[in-house]
Amino acid sequence: MNKYISVIVAGALAGMSASAQAEINLTAETASPGSTPGISVLALSEAAANANVANIQVTPGQTLTNSVQNVAEGKTDIAAAPFILPFLMSKAVGPYAKLGKEKGAELASQVAALYTYRISVQGLYAFDSSNIDGWNGIAGARIFNGPPRGAALTNARLLIKLNTGLEEGKGYTGVQVNWGQAVKTIQDGSADAFVLPMSFPDGRVTAALASGDMTIWSLPKSVYDSDAFAKVGKLPGTVPTELKIADMGYTSGVTVVSEDDTFRGPGTVGGEVVNVNMDFDVAKALTKAFIDGLDNVYRAKAPFMSNAWHGETDIALTDMCGNNPIKYHPGAVAAWEEAGYTIPDCAK
């Protein structure tokens, strides 16, 4: 797959016609290559090449806050996007506050989805050798909670406040590094615990097991069922998620703590996004390549990809519509419907 990874070159070619698909070069940005969005975008590059649709040059290890803005501005053709980001952009809040409301709304309107998936489920974990005994152990601790800016950091701060009432800088010390340094930071003692996006099984967790056994804590059921968490679940790109511990994919070295046999947490949903001005036929062909490659490309890439909700169009899992400003690209809609899927009118 390395042949699909290269430094982004200038000149997004999203406006080229489908008649020259075999010659199209597209650029894409995504998160770390071992994450769900990282593997998903790399899988798209493979599926598109297999179908002779396009050559997609992928730059992994990016902060997706920047990547989504690059797509909106036409600087990049494709990006992995947690759906909270276009929402924050549309309101010019959080990492997009400097854009201003008018500019933020304008940029957010330039982004459309090809397909969706569950990026991760946010949770707390720590080495068994640490002094962390669960969510109540966060007070006064150093918590690695994501890159310096982006959806992961925003969600982690929100989740910690929901569980403990603590804010970064007052109740605990936040540690932020880019995704490329994540495993090193988990292993080197820079933080006491980690509130990060997880897949099941999670690549960062399994890689860090070389430094010792770990424990993952579910959200307490009382918090998961609370009105406060229900409000979190209404944020665009957030889907309350329950998963049987037995289905999380861990064997030795990892203990999952819950009141029952179920892990609970906020699922982060997003998808691959493009500029709304991408050529209809190109967007359609890319989406068709995705659909055709679901089993032999996407779900075959990593153990956790089979439960990441690729190929779903039910808004209960995609979190399209409602407060989510993102719609499917018209070309993507055509590909989905030709493949026999139903796309809700509110997502078109």
Question: How should these model regions be labeled?
Answer:
Residues E23-Q57, S120-D188, S199-D202, I326-G331:
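Bilobed "Venus flytrap"/periplasmic-binding protein-like clamshell domains
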Residues F83-L85, A92-G94, G100-K103, S130, ...:
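Pocket-lining segment of extracytoplasmic ligand-binding domains
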Residues A139-N145, R149-L158, P236-A285, A289-E312:
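Ligand-binding clefts/hinges and TM-proximal coupling segments of bilobed small-molecule sensing domains
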